[in-house]
Amino acid sequence: MTDLPFVTADLPGSGGALRRAPEDFRVDEVPAYLPSGAGPHLYLRVEKRGRTTRDALRELARALGVPERDAGAAGLKDKDAVTTQWLSFPVARDPDPAALAAPGLRVLEVSRHQNKLRTGHVRANRFTLAVRGGDLARARDCAAALAARGLPNFFGPQRFGAAGRNAAVGRALVTGERSPEAGRAARDRFLRRLSLSAYQSLLFNRWLAERMADGRFAAALAGDVMKKLDTGGLFTCEDPATDGPRVERFEISPAGPMFGHALRLAGGEAGAREARLLEAEGIALADFVRGGGEAEGTRRAARLRIDVALEPLEDGYRAAFELPRGAYATVVMRELTKADAELPEED
């Protein structure tokens, strides 16, 4: 992410080291809904240390006597952290939580619900991170600036794969360029979707970086597709003088392009900016039909409200904050520390 701008570029970072131990990085999943307490699906809220979500699903499905494919999770969490989340299983009986305990895995709550948990059934993630050797006073200045200016909703480096290879393969799929990696991705639906998504994310980051460089990060442009931050609804900006103050109040945000063949188009000045980005890439929206037509296109908020709580540690500080699904803690910590680090986030 070294080529991306900071919204707090005028402030020095705290420095410090992230993630020296799993306990230094905690992620608590905030579900889209809570289990009702009744229904055919057993819901378990679990805490994991040094285990991935798939590890936990496999272990618990085996203990409960159900196929792993029938287990459900709203999101995948990395093993190099302490994480909590709900998992679901089609089990009629209520088990003893203690009997399900395993190394690095314990059950915190048991409930039931009518449906299986599925990918995306999550509202947000709550992060708690220790920054060893970080300067708390500097972190506080950066956190205050973020609260006032907003968080640029960049994709983190996890999205792009080692050395950005996933995005490069995605571009090859869109342009029709032939390569062994693109050939493999074209035949494998998982790799194809991963690569196309990485390329869409790369273009979004470029769009947002240009917007920040032009001083339009917290502004509404004529023709912008805008996103309501409370409901996710989209509309087109017709009067920047009316919508601009709403952007400043974090009611709405410009919604940047995740380019695809069926993308909702921006108009006016905003549409012209997006068209120039595509032209510079040498592609058109119709090119995204390649690769199976799965890259339909969508819109992503450019700017998020962020409230970072800080507290001192003997050797640094602890930062806690909540982000909506799809936003990256890496981006927050980069603003606070002014250092690039890849955190073990869901992706």
Curated annotation (Swiss-Prot):
The protein's role, per its UniProt record: Responsible for synthesis of pseudouridine from uracil-13 in transfer RNAs.
InterPro entries the UniProt entry points to: PsdUridine_synth_cat_dom_sf, PsdUridine_synth_TruD, PsdUridine_synth_TruD_CS, PsdUridine_synth_TruD_insert, TruD_catalytic, TruD_insert_sf, TruD_pseudoU_synthase
Keyword Isomerase recorded: yes
Protein name in UniProt: tRNA pseudouridine synthase D
Reaction(s) this enzyme catalyzes, per UniProt: uridine(13) in tRNA = pseudouridine(13) in tRNA
PANTHER family attached to this UniProt entry: TRNA PSEUDOURIDINE SYNTHASE D (PTHR47811:SF1)
Residue ranges of domain TRUD in the record: 150-304
Annotated GO MF terms: RNA binding; tRNA pseudouridine(13) synthase activity
Alphabetical keyword list: Isomerase, tRNA processing
Catalytic site: D78
GO biological process: tRNA pseudouridine synthesis
Domain of life: Bacteria
Alphabetized Gene3D superfamilies for the sequence: TruD, catalytic domain, TruD, insertion domain
EC number(s) recorded for this UniProt protein: 5.4.99.27
Similarity-based family: Belongs to the pseudouridine synthase TruD family.
Residue ranges the record marks as coiled coil: none
